[in-house]
């Protein structure tokens, strides 16, 4: 399995769970690292490479890197995997095994190719000025194994991963809404201008320019 494209950093760590949390105006001060940093030039190189027929024919299976990083993007590709986190290209030193495994740094792809085609795929990547490194191998044992600095830091059975977690049940009570304040009970608009300005002042309707400039869009 070849990791191709951008390098791995701390950006995006916790993004998968962070997107489901309640955020406030102070979130930008404490949750900035959960947002990935885009890399348009590298993305364009990947697109150009994948459009080449001689390249796409060598790919048995592939995944882009999103929520969960290496542990998910590579972890989904086969039932049995040995992943060497030391081989993952990094943006800077100091990352530990957990950070490398779950970082959601963007513009990365994981490709499954036949062992005899690895050198050929690496050569094609070099032609597009893309960094590409073999970081994992598919194994017969149905386990996801992550190694870092000579130690096994993750060793999970595929049967456990396929259960989607522990079974949970909860009791839910839905209260009947009162007539007053019912969102489905629409009132006749008496002042169009006032209603219009009220809508435009809503955070869900107003211009999102500030957010687009602040985060990865």
Give each language-model segment a name:
Residues 1-217:
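Glycine/proline-enriched, intrinsically flexible loops and inter-domain linkers
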């Amino acid at each position: 399995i070849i990791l191709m494209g951008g390098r791995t950093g701390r950006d995006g760590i916790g993004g998968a769970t962070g997107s489901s949390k309640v955020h406030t105006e102070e979130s930008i001060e404490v949750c900035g690292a959960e947002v990935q940093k885009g890399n348009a030039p590298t993305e364009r190189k990947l697109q150009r490479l994948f459009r080449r027929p001689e390249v796409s024919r060598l790919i048995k299976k592939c995944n882009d890197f999103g929520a969960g990083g290496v542990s998910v993007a590579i972890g989904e590709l086969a039932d049995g995997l040995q992943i060497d986190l030391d081989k993952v290209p990094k943006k800077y030193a100091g990352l530990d095994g957990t950070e490398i495994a779950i970082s959601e740094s963007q513009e990365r792809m994981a490709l499954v190719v036949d062992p005899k085609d690895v050198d050929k795929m690496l050569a094609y990547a070099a032609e597009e000025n893309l960094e590409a490194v073999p970081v994992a191998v598919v194994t017969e044992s149905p386990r996801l194994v992550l190694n870092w600095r000579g130690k096994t830091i993750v060793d999970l059975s595929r049967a456990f991963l396929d259960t989607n977690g522990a079974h949970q049940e909860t009791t839910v009570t839905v209260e009947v809404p009162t007539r007053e304040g019912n969102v489905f009970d629409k009132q006749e608009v008496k002042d169009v201008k006032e209603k219009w300005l009220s809508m435009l002042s809503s955070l869900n309707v107003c211009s999102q320019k500030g957010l687009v400039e602040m985060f990865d869009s």
